[in-house]
Amino acid sequence: TDNNASHEQWQADLGFWTGSTGRSLLSLPSFETDVYSGSSPHAETMERRALSLWQMGQTFPHYLLLSARSLITRTVGPKEVAALGAKIKIDEDHSPDDLVERLAASGYVREDPIANVGQFSVRGGILDVWSPDTDAPVRIEFFGDTVDSIRVFDPDTQLSTQRLKETSIAPMR
């Protein structure tokens, strides 16, 4: 695509046609900033790129929509992206402190309570996090380093809406 505006239009059009193929359509928008200009890329663009890079390593098969500029832009490899994200399952051991460090390193912001994608909160043995690949945040309860429960919750009421056996946390940048 020529730019991010046409990229979004192509994504909407192609999304209609790829829905019946069983393949996901991933989007890798360009930064649209000159690396030497000193200006930072838009945060939403960074989030969308990080999510697509994460999903490329998680789901198969898929289509990838990108611009020529995105194609030539250097990016981190699949192992580095996987290291920034996390897959969490009940009864697995994960150090809550290590998860908090990983969240901060991958672009999440600590807020209490969380209200938006890309935020996390820690209270005792409870970690709330809202990953960009989910529609609602999850609450992960630990007993020591062992994951005791994973629940989807409503950010407005803070009430649990669904129990999960596992969840993934995609990087934000």
Regions found by a protein language model. Give the residues of each.
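ASCE RecA-like P-loop NTPase motor cores
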Residues: 1-173
